Each structure stands twice: as C-alpha cells, then as structure tokens.
Amino acid sequence: MLPGLAAAAAAHRCSWSSLCRLRPRCRAAACNPSDCQEWQNLVTFGSFSNMVPCSHPYIGTLSQVKLYSTDVQKEGQGSQTLRVEKVPSFETAEGIGAELKAPLKQEPLQVRVKAVLKKREYGSKYTQNNFITGVRAINEFCLKSSDLEQLRKIRRRSPHEDTESFTVYLRSDVEAKSLEVWGSPEALAREKKLRKEAEIEYRERLFRNQKILREYRDFLGNTKPRSRTASVFFKGPGKVVMVAICINGLNCFFKFLAWIYTGSASMFSEAIHSLSDTCNQGLLALGISKSVQTPDPSHPYGFSNMRYISSLISGVGIFMMGAGLSWYHGVMGLLHPQPIESLLWAYCILAGSLVSEGATLLVAVNELRRNARAKGMSFYKYVMESRDPSTNVILLEDTAAVLGVIIAATCMGLTSITGNPLYDSLGSLGVGTLLGMVSAFLIYTNTEALLGRSIQPEQVQRLTELLENDPSVRAIHDVKATDLGLGKVRFKAEVDFDGRVVTRSYLEKQDFDQMLQEIQEVKTPEELETFMLKHGENIIDTLGAEVDRLEKELKKRNPEVRHVDLEIL
C-alpha cells in the first residue's frame, strides 16, 4: 500500500508539508485484504495532510470528508463568498493517485454574510457637530455679521419659551471662517486680547457716570425690566410687615419712656422686645424687597430664598437682642433689686401696646389663613412648615408680644401689691424665655426651608399622573419637586419614553411615498447609512420636541411650576 501511496503523491506533483506517522494495527503476516483496507480516508486542508484510519472511534463511521475553503470576494461591500467543496472517499491508495490527477468536481455553495457597519472612533474630543449661536460666533471669534452670512445656517429648537426656533452655525465652519479672516490662531488670540482690553477700558470710563452707564445698557438691550419693589408693600406679606413696623416702632418709643420713668425691669424687657421686633421687621422688609428682584445670570432661579434668609437672621436677632438682654436685666434685678416708682403710666402704655399688638396679630392671622386656604392646607400646617416666612415671623413676634405684655403686666401688678421688686425681675426672665422659644422656632423652620423642602405629596402625585397619562411616556422615575419660595416650584423627573410612539409621531409628519422611494433606491451600505442617519437625527429632534411639549403642558396646567427638568431615561 505504501508504494502505491508514494506513486500517487508523485503523480499529483503536490508539495505535502507533512505525513503523519502510520500505526499499523495488524502485522504484515496476518494482514488480510479486507484488513488492509483500514486506511481509507485522506483529509487535506491547505498544505497539511493526514491519514486517518477508518477504525478510529470518531471518524470510522464517516463515508466521506468535506473540504471547506473560503474565498473572500468583494460583492458590493462587506459581503463574502463561502465555497464548499466535496471530496469523495477513496477505497485504495492507487485510487488516491487517480483521483488526485483528475480535476476535483466542485459544487460551490454561495452564502451571504451580513454587512456590519464599521464603528467610528471619535476620540476623547469631537466638536465637528457642535452648533454655536451668532452672538457667540461674533464675540468669541471676532467676526462680523457679514462674515456669518457666507456660512451655512441651521434652524434649531429654541431653549427659551418665548421663541420657537433660532439660527445656529456649525462651530467648525465658524472656526474655519475665523482662520480665513485672521490668518492664524495666534492672530485671533491677539485680537481677542485687544478687544477685551478695549472693552474693560470702555466700561471703566462709563462707570464714572452712572447715568451714562444706564443709558449704555438700555441702548444695548442688556438689562431686563426692573422689578417694582414698592408695590409688594401694599399687599400680602409686605403689607403685614409695614403695618408691624409702624406699630412696633411706636410701642418701642413709648415703652422706653415708661421704663425711664418707672425703672421697671419688666418694662425694660418689653421695650427691648419692641425694639428687636422693629429691627427684625425692617430686616424682613429688606428680604421681601430683594426676593422680588428679576433673576440674573449669577442667580438664574431668582432671589426668592431671601425671605427665608432674612427670617433666619431675624430669629437669631430675637435671640441675641431680645432674649439675651431680657435675661440679663432680669438676673441683675434679682441680684440688685431696685425700688420701683409709680406704675400708672406703665399700665397705660402696656394697655395701648396690647391693643396695637393684638391688631397686628389679627392682620397676620388673616393673611396666613387666606394663603393656607389658597394652598389647600390647614392653618396649623401652613404655619409649622413656614410656607410664608415673613408673615410667619410677624405672627410669632406679635403672639410673643401679646403674651409678653400679659406677663409684664401680671408681674408688675404683683410688685405693686406686694412691694417686692423680685416679681418684676421674674417677669423680665419670663419675657426673655418666651422670646428665646420664638427665636428657636424661627431658626428651625427657616433652616428646613433653605435646605430644600418638597411640595405637598398630593401635588407631586398630580404632576406625576399628568406625565404618566401622556401616550409617549412609559414610566416616571426619581421625581423631585421642591419649593423655591414665593409660590414657585421646581420639578425634576426621569422619563422613560415609548420609542414607538415617538417614532410614529415623526412618521405621521412624513410623506410615505417619498420614504418608500428612498428605501427602494438604497443599494449599498453607504446609502443605507445616509438614509438611517437622516431619519435618526429627525427622530431625536422629535424626542426633544416631545420633552418641550410636556414641560409646557406642566407649566400651563400648574402655574406655580416655574422650572421643569425632564431627563430622558
């Protein structure tokens, strides 16, 4: 058998790279003709040749071996042709030589392989698709309006509520135009530096005259409408604060006169109490005036928190000035009691103070009840959560003032009856303790408000259901709705959009006949990529339009919602 195998190999004139060792399983003396047919299959793969006995447990049952080879050919692009060839089985070694001499019968089998779009590597920085507004192009790249007229203009959705769309330019086009105008990046940098220095010098000259500076800003349109802070003091919390300032100022003046005339420690505490109330209410008026100012670039969400800040400082002031001085004067009265003069005038002033403080208290209570009813909350809950910090301070201060007048009058009466000045000193300590409790409550409630407090759960549920009832929304997650003060709410949520509904919304605006014609014209992967990129970008724009629509719907149905952030999940 071996000579026949060698002859067959020589006749075929093929270079065999290797010939595996043969392990005869029977001796030559005992080899029968049937046993000598043990070597039946020859497997050829490239330059590797191997002879496998038919009695091998894995291959002995095979009647033939298939030879697979692949030829990569360009058909269009990205396709491969897979050719499958059949190799017949050989009964003898002589048959091997004859078959090797004869040409193999090939039955090619064409298999189409999917074309895969090659992934693009954009790198860590890619700005070729960035857009830039005309104002930024002129300021940052030192261009003129005439330079921008030569560039491609693109209309995009506006991020502002007052305009539907605006014009932008490709940043790469603007950069190329700036290099064309200025010649090099170094020349552009020098020009920007010169312009910045000239602008600084120009502004410094203008600051010397405030009237010219205002005219300059109005001419350029850089200022927004000025807020009318005077009107806030004629209604709502501002009106309550102004009434309290006037009444407490008069009470403070008369109480100090009574203290100077009588020398009473309780009257001194009441005078200090009225003085601290007047100062704190002046601070509240400043906070109200600041809170209605128009937002600026440094404070995009406005100044509404100034009410909480002024109320917090007011609470600290009550503790330091009111409670501290009252305790000090009461302790000094206990350690060094002084004789008290006639208390008739003191009683008259306390009576007048009780009436005036009570009137202010009623004004504050009515204002808080009206606001609580508008919010759908109970009076107690509205006060405890400090929804209206300025009016809340007035309410607590006037409540403490009324109770303080009662405490002072009681202790002064005991002193008049018994002649013991210790009762008057105890009254001073009682008023100081009352002021300390009020200040602690104000500090706590306003600190909670400044940390960021959620709105009512019922209101959050209503906003969430409004989004979930929209067909384009699958689910809402991570909802956060915080109170910004002055009845303003900020709403944030993660939205899981239904891609099919968004895509259908886009398709409803398209011409199906034209799209079908475009699909039929697609023949190559490049044309398919262009088709998909075109409509994919439009679908993304449709998704952005859906976000804008939902935000406008939320603000329209809930006027208290001023800022909406919907994140696509």
From Swiss-Prot:
It comes from the Eukaryota. The chain crosses the membrane at residues 240-260, 315-335, 343-363, 393-413, 425-445. This is Proton-coupled zinc antiporter SLC30A9, mitochondrial. Its main location: mitochondrion. GO terms for molecular function: antiporter activity; zinc ion transmembrane transporter activity. It holds the Pfam family Cation_efflux. It is a multi-pass membrane protein. It is found in: Mitochondrion membrane; Nucleus; Endoplasmic reticulum. Disulfide bonds: none annotated. It catalyses: Zn(2+)(in) + 2 H(+)(out) = Zn(2+)(out) + 2 H(+)(in). Gene3D superfamilies: Cation efflux protein transmembrane domain, XPA C-terminal domain. One of its GO terms (cellular component) is mitochondrial membrane. The keyword Ribonucleoprotein does not apply. Mitochondrial proton-coupled zinc ion antiporter mediating the export of zinc from the mitochondria and involved in zinc homeostasis, zinc mobilization as well as mitochondrial morphology and health. In nucleus, functions as a secondary coactivator for nuclear receptors by cooperating with p160 coactivators subtypes. Plays a role in transcriptional activation of Wnt-responsive genes. NCBIfam families: CDF (TIGR01297). A motif (LXXLL motif) lies at residues 463-467. GO terms for biological process: intracellular zinc ion homeostasis; regulation of mitochondrion organization; zinc ion transport. SUPFAM superfamilies: Cation efflux protein transmembrane domain-like (SSF161111), Putative DNA-binding domain (SSF46955). Residues 1-68 form a transit peptide. Keywords: Antiport, Endoplasmic reticulum, Ion transport, Membrane, Mitochondrion, Nucleus, Transcription, Transcription regulation, Transit peptide, Transmembrane, Transmembrane helix, Transport, Zinc, Zinc transport. Interacts with GRIP1, ESR1, AR and CTNNB1. InterPro entries: Cation_efflux, Cation_efflux_TMD_sf, DNA-bd_dom_put_sf, SLC30A9, XPA_sf. Belongs to the cation diffusion facilitator (CDF) transporter (TC 2.A.4) family. SLC30A subfamily. Coiled coil: none annotated.
